[in-house]
């Protein structure tokens, strides 16, 4: 299922969306390629090759999450992002770390199901067309009548005609489930019962809709009939085991420092609970057992207060690749505004175009935006590229509000307009830190 790229191609693809941070891009590109290399090996050796998990160190807003998320999208791999602070040691109130793997399996099932749906889309569309014709002319109509209506249907002449269709009532089969504390996967029995009763009942509901709007629910319905659910689950478990990527953010927040308070006990407990996951263990899910041996773990943190060496030595050893991401410079911020395929400026221009307003942002305006972002990051708090969104929203506030009334006009943003719009924000910067 995973798409194969060479490390150079992976870095090149990441460059389209993320500025700078070449060391981090190289590390994740090599890790991705090593997965493909492992799958080319024979059985015994393949089992021995473990993924080289990565620890990204760098301030907020420099691209840590963006790199991991783009990597997963690029590879077509199941990806889950979690914050380390959301989890608690087993025995405390809160989520336990095994839920990370269960979430990964759910995402893998969604990915595999979408892939399988695409494979049966043509067949499902043909079946859906037959059901629309049944609703239009009845099942007993002559072949000539059906063909006549089929031609009209394909030409779009019947799009607005109202019909009644019968589709599966998926909601009727859903049963609320819960995990029993200390018994991961204990909801399996409940799920199996709901599936049994669902198959026995096979309930449907009648919907009144237009011919045009009927196709989507009918295609979904027919796709489900053509899919083998057991095969989807088995493939999803395999994909999650071999291609899954888990991104653990804010891992520095659970690093314990010498002389810490009692809360450090729970933080250290979370680290100890993470150890078997990262090293390789078997987790029970409602779909079956899943091994975590070959899942790629990418941990990240700013490490402003703590240091990577404050993590448990065992956990440090399971994150062998260390990458430091650099703080963003003025030039980086300027490039972020313009170079990525979906840069902020391109986004705002596209949004205004939906209102028939032509937005132009000059080069000196881009320089001014970058300068202001750097200044605010230095004077308040360094939140990296996220500061650009704050600045852009303030600058374009007026045009965003009045755009519906100015269809067919052009609007030019230059350095003078930027400074005029942002003046009060920059002036109040010293006061803003005292506002709760």
Swiss-Prot record:
Record's function text: ATPase subunit of a proteasome-like degradation complex; this subunit has chaperone activity. The binding of ATP and its subsequent hydrolysis by HslU are essential for unfolding of protein substrates subsequently hydrolyzed by HslV. HslU recognizes the N-terminal part of its protein substrates and unfolds these before they are guided to HslV for hydrolysis.
Binding partners and assembly: A double ring-shaped homohexamer of HslV is capped on each side by a ring-shaped HslU homohexamer. The assembly of the HslU/HslV complex is dependent on binding of ATP.
Residues passing through the membrane, by range: none
Family named by the database record: Belongs to the ClpX chaperone family. HslU subfamily.
Name of the protein in question: ATP-dependent protease ATPase subunit HslU
Main subcellular localisation: cytoplasm
Annotated compartments: Cytoplasm
The entry's keywords: ATP-binding, Chaperone, Cytoplasm, Nucleotide-binding
Amino-acid positions noted as binding ATP in the UniProt annotation, renumbered to this chain: 19, 61-65, 249, 314, 386
GO molecular function annotation: ATP binding; ATP hydrolysis activity; peptidase activity; proteasome-activating activity
An annotated GO cellular component: HslUV protease complex
GO terms under biological process: protein unfolding; proteolysis involved in protein catabolic process
